[in-house]
């Protein structure tokens, strides 16, 4: 049975170069042929945050490319196109995810079963610097990605402490380890 919709692979191949030119990559494509109208969701991510203007521009370009399909690939009927960022519910699973989450608060589950909450710092050679609360100040703990079982960005409703954010933005992994800064 044909759905009249392109496959996930076809959408990625069709849109990938345009998204890359804008500085974003397609993380996932979800096609729901059972929805009415059918839905094509394109999840994009990049080093720069995906703002509303960029989403609108990417959506317009994606729509034009998808509507321009012809022959056997032509989309039959109406469909709903969604272009969005991965959102906070997406687990961080690769170096690029941690690099893009720098400065964000995350909760980690480690391979030994322990949990840590901290702010993502520098990502280097398979190791992430995590700024954690220690006594009355902040410390940087280096954690190999291989030891992280699960990592999820936490939603924050108040700004971080300046010293915490400064450590997370520091580009010298290891220099700040064990140092204390005022809360």
UniProtKB/Swiss-Prot annotation:
Cellular compartment(s): Cytoplasm
UniProt keyword terms in alphabetical order: Cytoplasm, Ribosome biogenesis
Top-rank taxon: Bacteria
Principal subcellular localisation of the protein: cytoplasm
A GO CC annotation given for this chain: plasma membrane
Keyword Oxidoreductase among record annotations: no
Transferase recorded as keyword: no
Coiled coil ranges: none
InterPro entries, alphabetized: Ribosome_maturation_RimP, RimP_C, RimP_C_sf, RimP_N, RimP_N_sf
Pfam families the UniProt entry points to: DUF150_C, RimP_N
GO biological process: ribosomal small subunit assembly; translation
CDD domains assigned to the protein according to its UniProt record, in alphabetical order: YlxS_C
Annotated function: Required for maturation of 30S ribosomal subunits.
Database matches in PANTHER family: RIBOSOME MATURATION FACTOR RIMP (PTHR33867:SF1)
Family membership: Belongs to the RimP family.
Extra remark beyond the main annotation: Was identified as a high-confidence drug target.
Name recorded for this polypeptide: Ribosome maturation factor RimP
């Amino acid at each position: 049975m044909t759905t009249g919709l392109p496959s996930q692979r076809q959408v990625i191949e069709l849109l990938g170069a345009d998204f890359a030119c804008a500085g974003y990559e397609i993380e996932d494509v979800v096609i729901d042929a059972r929805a009415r109208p059918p839905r094509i969701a394109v999840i994009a991510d990049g080093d720069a945050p995906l703002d509303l203007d960029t989403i609108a521009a990417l959506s317009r370009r994606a729509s034009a490319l998808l509507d321009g399909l012809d022959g056997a690939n032509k989309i039959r009927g109406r469909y709903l196109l969604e272009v969005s960022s991965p959102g906070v519910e997406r687990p961080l699973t690769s170096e690029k995810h941690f690099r893009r989450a720098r400065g964000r608060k995350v909760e980690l589950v480690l391979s030994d079963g322990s949990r840590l909450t901290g702010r993502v710092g520098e990502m280097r050679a398979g190791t992430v610097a995590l700024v954690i609360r220690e006594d009355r100040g902040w410390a940087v703990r280096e954690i190999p990605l291989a030891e992280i079982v699960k990592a999820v960005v936490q939603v924050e409703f108040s700004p971080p402490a300046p010293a915490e954010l400064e450590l997370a933005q520091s580009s010298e992994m290891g220099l700040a380890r064990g140092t204390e800064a005022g809360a």
